[in-house]
Amino acid sequence: MRAKVRILDVFSGRYSVFINEEEAKKAKLHPDDLVKVESGKKTIYGSLAISNLVGPGEVGVSRDVLQLHSLSEGEVVTLTPVGTPESVRYIKKKMHGEKLRKVEIEAIVRDIVDRKLRDIEISSFVTALEINGLDMDEIAALTIAMAETGDMLDIDRKPIMDVHSIGGVPGNKTNILVVPIVAAAGLTIPKTSSRAITSAAGTADVVEVFTNVSFSLDEIKRIVEKVGACLVWGGALNLAPADDITIKAERALSVDPRGLMLASIMSKKYAMGSQYVLIDIPTGKGVKVETMDEARALARDFIELGKRLGQYVEVAITYGGQPIGHTVGPALEAREALSALMTGKGPGSLIEKALGLAGILLEMGGVAPAGMGKKMAREILESGKAYEKMKEIIEEQGGDPNIKPEDIQIGDKTYTFTAPTSGYVTGIDNRAITGIARAAGAPEDKGAGLELYVKVGEKVKEGDPLFTIHAESEARLDQAIVFARRTEPIKIEGMVLQRIGNI
């Protein structure tokens, strides 16, 4: 059928094409049918939605569609039904536990990106991977397919380094120190980061407090060619676009298939042209990987996958049992990171982890002898060279290079929790800390979060401050206080844990 485009000011949460009931009956089309919309050289696939939002002779497209395709109001298009893609048969193969060939994986990924697969079919694929898994041949094929169906970055400055943390630890602003340290040593490190999904602040959320993070691939190339590094938001780029689509299914199903997680991370490193990749796997209670055995197994998979992609990969298993540094939340973390860069000093957990990771990268990149990377990283940080490099990065990304920590606004609605008894801090609940910061408004409210005054093993007296919640509104502060009282994120115990009488 031929019809005129009507742009609907809605986000359906799906890749939908709308027609009204009368047109659907005439064309014998049904809800969720896969349809193709063509106009000249433009071809768009989507799931059919039947709605009275459009009239006869109209095809409605949602804002979701317009984010990826340019269509004009009133543009004449042709809408036709499309048969079931061959890739659906390959998904069924994996549902039955069979191994997929490279060409089959490529077909699935291509159809995900082209929107030929509907939400239910993508969810079936993700479920099949969760239940039946992928072997390393399949993971490598999936990784390359995910990268090559999106944009690829080609940077002349070599070698290209990269670092990625699989996350789970509150307050992890480590890479804001690592990147300028590595770049100050003459290595190239184009760092793309995510925004928070379930955490209180992703690296991109923190960096955005003091400079821009959304750039095109050409702009990133210009920045990196000039200063040797960047700290940008990966979501503004068309890197491994299938990943963004499958993540929605993973969230809806509350699953995280191991093979898909490996491909998700490494496809973006492959697309960025990274030659040397350091993976940070935080381990401990309350993070994604809780045991050393799990961490070692995952490390082996990353290293093997890197070999198949032509990348040299090393893994750092790091302590993740409590927050990094003393702050959680975008603006608070930005203050702490900038202060550490300016002074060369800061919380031990932040400084030591940043220097440890940067040191490994310096050794991987061949600018520091084996075993001397951390020492070199410390010299770069304490000499101010890392701070000067960070100022260059901030300026090239459109921020004020002379910004000071105190210039950054934090939430002025505060409440401080104190120790209910004297004793020792025996545990800090990562998930509870994250939950409190999010209840306070982070990451959307940049000034929201919390400041920690104690760490595990420290002695406290009754009435000593434990942490302060920051919020931008009284309502958010009240929510965070209620959440904190319910979860009791900091555990304090005396030396006598329990008294048992004579029975």
From Swiss-Prot:
Gene3D superfamilies from the UniProt entry: 1.20.970.50, 2.40.40.20, Nucleoside phosphorylase/phosphoribosyltransferase catalytic domain (3.40.1030.10), Pyrimidine nucleoside phosphorylase-like, C-terminal domain (3.90.1170.30)
Residues holding AMP: G168, S194, R195, A196, I197, T198, S199, T203, S264, K288
Role of this protein: Catalyzes the conversion of AMP and phosphate to adenine and ribose 1,5-bisphosphate (R15P). Exhibits phosphorylase activity toward CMP and UMP in addition to AMP. Functions in an archaeal AMP degradation pathway, together with R15P isomerase and RubisCO.
GO biological process: AMP catabolic process; pyrimidine deoxyribonucleoside metabolic process; pyrimidine nucleobase metabolic process
Similarity comment: family membership: Belongs to the thymidine/pyrimidine-nucleoside phosphorylase family. Type 2 subfamily.
Active-site feature positions: D256 (proton donor)
Listed EC numbers: 2.4.2.57
EC class name: transferase
InterPro entries: AMP_phosphorylase, Glycosyl_Trfase_fam3, Glycosyl_Trfase_fam3_N_dom, Glycosyl_Trfase_fam3_N_dom_sf, Nuc_phospho_transferase, PYNP-like_C_sf, PYNP_C, Pyrmidine_PPase_CS
Protein name, per record: AMP phosphorylase
Entry GO CC: cytosol
Keywords: Glycosyltransferase, Transferase
GO molecular function, one term: pentosyltransferase activity
Reaction catalysed by this enzyme: AMP + phosphate = alpha-D-ribose 1,5-bisphosphate + adenine; CMP + phosphate = cytosine + alpha-D-ribose 1,5-bisphosphate; UMP + phosphate = alpha-D-ribose 1,5-bisphosphate + uracil
UniProt KW Glycosyltransferase keyword: yes
